[in-house]
């Protein structure tokens, strides 16, 4: 009689007909992976038949799991409706209203005058359709094919190919018996003859240990360091500043009024801290305060200017450099993290990286600014770049900078302009002009490396990390040797 390890015996016992291995694993209260070694051993001993079958399955993405928990955007918008007996009215104040409208439009629902107005029966019909879609997302195994295709397009699910392992006993159950597994015998086992009742686990020294891919650096850190190299190669000097910043450098020195909407709590992370903080020089605070009171016509508060925030822009660092260096001809840049209360989605994050730079010198013009921006973009390997007029409180004229993403289309990744006199003169810069810009490096990396979701820049998925590092290596080889130089 053949002696088998207990787990293998249990598999043979339960597999008198073809059965999925994962089903047997559930019965035994173990994982399928833990049984694989015994399956291979059973096949080698001729007591098991093994058949591998392949099937396509659908799994929720991170976004899909979020929608199962919180609801689809269109579902949440419809549930916010105010209804009477005849009609339902939906105000478009929900933060996800634009995304919800895009999906509701496919059902013939369109807004008028900033609201959606539907008859009661149409509302209930549309809501029932969305509820069916919500249930299908939560139960993918029974979801109709057309909804699965829609979920794929919306990146709520992903298609995966699974390998299903089926096993069947190849020997009669009465020809095998379970035994205790032993990897070492004692002298007592040998003397008493008990070793005959044990299953002695064989050692196969020819088996190679499992191969693991070599670790690679994080592709996004490599990208940020490469941007530093490019900027230094273009004649810029790097400066650094604190993440925890006083409002003065983050807002006031940039001519943003103290009642500006960007300084509200829904756009800025305020930090409560009773300890010491670095105060700006008194003469700068007085000069900036005078400009605010003269131009914006309100009573400027030095106490508010000393409140602490997590910096919302790295311009706080370049404006510090401008205040320290004053007049002259120089170029500086900084790369750092900034923080804003954004809702996390494929294009937005509450924490991201900015490249901020300034060029200081007499006689600089808007043409110089656009030329400098285009030169940096080309040095980083961007294809098509375009500019659109924009408004920022501290620059004039101003532009937004766009680049073409392979799948997302034109993506805005930065703003730029010439610092207004209200910014430069209180800092003592009266004869030079200052070209300034801030770029979102997370979006730049997405454009250059073909990444569709900003959250993937910080993914823990090892397969994705290796894939993106391979893209980074290809990008660096193709762009990193151009050696573009630019002088201004």
Swiss-Prot record:
Binds 2 magnesium ions per tetramer. Keywords: Aminoacyl-tRNA synthetase, ATP-binding, Cytoplasm, Ligase, Magnesium, Metal-binding, Nucleotide-binding, Protein biosynthesis. One of its GO terms (molecular function) is phenylalanine-tRNA ligase activity. L-phenylalanine binds at residues 315, 354-356, 394, 419. Its EC number is 6.1.1.20. It comes from the Archaea. It is found in: Cytoplasm. Gene3D superfamilies: 1.10.10.2320, 1.10.10.2330, 3.30.1370.240, Bira Bifunctional Protein, Domain 2. GO terms for cellular component: cytoplasm. InterPro entries: aa-tRNA-synth_II, aa-tRNA-synth_II/BPL/LPL, Phe-tRNA-synth_IIc_asu, Phe_tRNA_ligase_alpha_bac/arc, Phenylalanyl-tRNA_Synthase. SUPFAM superfamilies: Class II aaRS and biotin synthetases (SSF55681). It catalyses: tRNA(Phe) + L-phenylalanine + ATP = L-phenylalanyl-tRNA(Phe) + AMP + diphosphate + H(+). Its cofactor is Mg(2+). It is an enzyme of class 6 (ligase). One of its GO terms (biological process) is phenylalanyl-tRNA aminoacylation. Belongs to the class-II aminoacyl-tRNA synthetase family. Phe-tRNA synthetase alpha subunit type 2 subfamily. Tetramer of two alpha and two beta subunits. This is Phenylalanine--tRNA ligase alpha subunit.
């Amino acid at each position: 009689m053949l002696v088998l390890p207990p787990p293998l015996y249990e598999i043979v016992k339960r597999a008198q007909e073809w059965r999925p291995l994962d089903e047997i694993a559930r019965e035994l209260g173990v994982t399928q992976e833990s049984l694989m070694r015994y399956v291979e051993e059973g096949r080698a001993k001729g007591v098991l038949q093994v058949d591998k079958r392949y099937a396509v399955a659908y799994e929720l993405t991170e976004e899909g799991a979020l929608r199962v928990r919180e609801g689809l955007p269109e579902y949440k918008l419809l549930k916010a409706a105010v209804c009477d007996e005849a009609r339902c009215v939906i105000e478009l104040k929900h933060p996800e209203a634009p995304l919800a409208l895009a999906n509701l439009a496919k059902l013939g629902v369109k807004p008028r005058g900033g609201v959606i107005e539907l008859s009661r029966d149409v509302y209930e019909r549309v809501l029932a359709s969305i509820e069916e879609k919500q249930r299908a997302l939560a139960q993918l195994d029974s979801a109709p094919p057309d909804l699965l295709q829609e979920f794929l397009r919306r990146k709520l699910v992903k298609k995966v190919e699974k390998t299903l392992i089926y096993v069947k006993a190849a020997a009669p159950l009465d020809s095998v018996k379970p035994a205790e597994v032993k990897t070492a015998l004692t002298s007592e086992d040998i003397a008493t003859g008990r070793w005959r009742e044990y299953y002695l686990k064989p050692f196969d020294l020819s088996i190679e240990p499992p191969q693991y891919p070599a670790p690679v650096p994080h592709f996004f850190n490599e990208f940020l360091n490469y941007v530093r190299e490019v900027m230094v190669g273009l004649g810029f000097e790097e400066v650094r500043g604190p993440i925890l910043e006083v409002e003065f450098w983050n807002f006031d020195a940039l001519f943003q009024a103290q009642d500006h909407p960007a300084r509200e709590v829904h756009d800025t992370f305020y930090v409560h801290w009773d300890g010491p903080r670095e105060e700006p020089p008194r003469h700068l605070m007085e000069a900036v305060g005078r400009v605010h009171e003269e131009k914006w016509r309100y009573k400027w508060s030095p106490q508010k200017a000393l409140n602490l925030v997590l910096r919302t822009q790295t311009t706080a660092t370049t404006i510090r450099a401008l205040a320290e260096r004053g007049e002259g001809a120089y170029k500086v840049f900084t790369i750092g993290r900034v923080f804003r209360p954004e809702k996390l989605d494929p294009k937005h994050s509450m924490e991201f990286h900015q490249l901020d730079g300034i060029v200081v010198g007499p006689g600089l013009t808007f043409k110089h600014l656009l030329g400098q921006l285009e030169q940096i973009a080309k040095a980083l390997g961007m294809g098509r770049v375009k500019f659109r007029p924009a408004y920022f409180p501290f620059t004039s004229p101003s532009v937004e900078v766009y680049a073409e993403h392979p799948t997302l289309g034109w993506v805005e990744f930065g703003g730029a302009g010439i610092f207004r006199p209200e910014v430069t003169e209180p800092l003592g810069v009266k004869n030079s002009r200052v070209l300034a810009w801030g770029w979102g490096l997370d979006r730049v990396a997405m454009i250059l490396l073909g990444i569709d979701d900003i959250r993937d820049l910080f993914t823990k998925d090892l397969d994705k990390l290796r894939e993106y590092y391979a893209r980074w290596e290809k990008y660096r080889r193709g762009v990193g040797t151009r050696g573009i130089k630019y002088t201004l």
